[in-house]
């Protein structure tokens, strides 16, 4: 299993409508790309205050590394990636491979 963690430092002018559109794109991925087990997204709720400007994030859980590797060049990934780049000043990606 691979957890694909993506953190976004949002631009100051990002609207709730834009974030809702982004969440909708993400939510549709499991039905469109084989090997995606789940998608979760939202703003940070951590009380620690250690986000360093990364106030929004999403987590895509893949069945395995092959599924993650198929997702990256997949045509359904492109709109997600493009919108993330529009919404964010900075993007941080961190993948964690674990056994079930």
Describe the residue ranges of each PLM region.
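Short S/T/G/P-rich N-terminal loop/turn motif that feeds into the first structured element of a domain
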Residues: 1-55, 63-73, 96-100
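A common structural junction motif
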Residues: 27-33, 76-82, 88
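Conserved catalytic core of Hanks-type protein kinase domains
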Residues: 61-62, 87
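Charge-dense polyanion-binding interfaces
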Residues: 84-100
